[in-house]
Amino acid sequence: MSPQTETKANVGFKAGVKDYKLTYYTPEYETLDTDILAAFRVSPQPGVPPEEAGAAVAAESSTGTWTTVWTDGLTSLDRYKGRCYHIEPVAGEENQYICYVAYPLDLFEEGSVTNMFTSIVGNVFGFKALRALRLEDLRIPVAYVKTFQGPPHGIQVERDKLNKYGRPLLGCTIKPKLGLSAKNYGRAVYEVLRGGLDFTKDDENVNSQPFMRWRDRFLFCAEALYKAQAETGEIKGHYLNATAGTCEDMMKRAVFARELGVPIVMHDYLTGGFTANTTLSHYCRDNGLLLHIHRAMHAVIDRQKNHGIHFRVLAKALRLSGGDHIHSGTVVGKLEGERDITLGFVDLLRDDYTEKDRSRGIYFSQSWVSTPGVLPVASGGIHVWHMPALTEIFGDDSVLQFGGGTLGHPWGNAPGAVANRVALEACVQARNEGRDLAREGNTIIREASKWSPELAAACEIWKEIKFEFPAMDTV
């Protein structure tokens, strides 16, 4: 009799409640290459042993429930159950543990981040026996990775489409984020693209509000980028936000963007949802559109150290679901992001293989086989003085995005774009000449500002601006 149809009728059914650890805590278990592995930060309630807490997580996120049920005998729990196979205390924290759980691959629908998360980060996060629970990392087996399309195009295809190599790409989020008419919005897009930026971006809040309906915005932005392309000889793009209240409206906007011939659209993947995101990603692959991803709502999920989901997990999920860019924090700007932790998940986005490295928060080695990489986008409170650090931290395969750091230039939008392009070109040239950007960054910017009045003005206006607060996200 096959494991799927094997029953336990000959053993007999014993009703009642038993400890989770009797079934789901298996320290002797040797993980399989096909298992999905999870590292949970578990904070048990007082009096709950860590073995019981870890087993409860494994049970409630796989086959278990609070009591023994008769229908357990109609399947093979050993085949399908999650297993807590290792527990270690968290250094410096009282009554907090990292519990490692292995899930058989058969528990999950192929190609569905939605289904994977519904199990692994579902009802178990409200379990009363736990004070708090955080998913720190996932190991996605190659067998499961290959069931996903992944990013529509990836880093190399994007560079080939844009014909831009050897430097980070430059972007700008149009501000104010809400309230502009479509024509004035398009004017700002044109001015900064003409000034030297590669991309402009809809703010994540911009969908189709009364002050600016989506179709009007798409038309004026397309006109702006084509005009800027004609004048500069460079390929330009604007992230047209296709996020909508329904998947049907989202796809209608993506189709219209394709008909306009623009190179890239955008989606808010957490508020929009993984099913919608994967659908849009497949459309973008089939129709030659790049896909920019914003992570609005991520801090609600990932910022608390002891509860939620770490962003490295959300980043892995995005690489599976599909996106060519994703916002990743800046390390040096106004938004949360500690350097080693940030670079840990940046590598998870870009590289084919990432080694386990607990100093960077990476709990498992991860292979992406042939899945394309995702460009990290550094955005939020950055300006020209940050350019050396951003270039050194993120390297060439990144998008450096300056909203207020472009449009806040005292001489206007186009000079703000010029200042950023000059600063970037100076940093890339200095790096290629062997100069140390971390040590000589300010000197490099000052030298460049001597022959660029736009950069000099930007340096003066933002010379005192710093965002220095301790990071919440630490190992």
UniProtKB/Swiss-Prot annotation:
Residues engaged in binding Mg(2+): K201, D203, E204
Record's cofactor remark: Binds 1 Mg(2+) ion per subunit.
GO molecular function: magnesium ion binding; monooxygenase activity; ribulose-bisphosphate carboxylase activity
Subunit field text: Heterohexadecamer of 8 large chains and 8 small chains; disulfide-linked. The disulfide link is formed within the large subunit homodimers.
Entry annotation: catalytic residues: K175, H294
Cofactor: Mg(2+)
Keyword Secreted: no
Location of N6,N6,N6-trimethyllysine modifications: K14
Major location category of this protein: plastid
Listed EC numbers: 4.1.1.39
PROSITE patterns, A to Z: RUBISCO_LARGE
The protein, known as: Ribulose bisphosphate carboxylase large chain
